[in-house]
Amino acid sequence: MIPGEYQLAEGDILANVGRKTVKIEVTNSGDRPIQVGSHYHFFETNNALKFDRTLARGMRLNVPSGNAVRFEPGEVKSVELVAFGGNQIIYGFHNQIDGKL
């Protein structure tokens, strides 16, 4: 091995396989851009984002870890959400859940 060399496996990296997903349409009704990170509880996002929040409970964006989706003012965008894994316990964000889903 050469210092700094990468040894990568062949093939694609699969994430969120077997988890529940849902596609929703989101509108930014505000006057400023809103960016949502990969692991933010989508149900608790900025109220200027208009969408069916009941579908988003316990869900996050289905994008690679560390990525985000930006919603420009007035923009309508379709996004895919994926269910949180683990014990389904959510704390923080806007403190709307603070416990088990």
From Swiss-Prot:
Similarity field: Belongs to the urease beta subunit family.
GO cellular component entries: urease complex
Record-level Gene Ontology MF annotations: urease activity
Pathway participation: Nitrogen metabolism; urea degradation; CO(2) and NH(3) from urea (urease route): step 1/1
Keywords: Cytoplasm, Hydrolase
UniProt keyword annotation of Iron-sulfur present: no
E.C. code: 3.5.1.5
Quaternary state and interactors: Heterotrimer of UreA (gamma), UreB (beta) and UreC (alpha) subunits. Three heterotrimers associate to form the active enzyme.
Biological process terms in GO annotation: urea catabolic process
Catalytic activity, as annotated: urea + 2 H2O + H(+) = hydrogencarbonate + 2 NH4(+)
EC category name: hydrolase
Pfam families: Urease_beta (PF00699)
Superkingdom classification of source: Bacteria
Cleaved signal peptide residues: none
Hydrolase listed as a keyword: yes
Location relative to the cell: Cytoplasm
Gene: ureB
Protein known as: Urease subunit beta
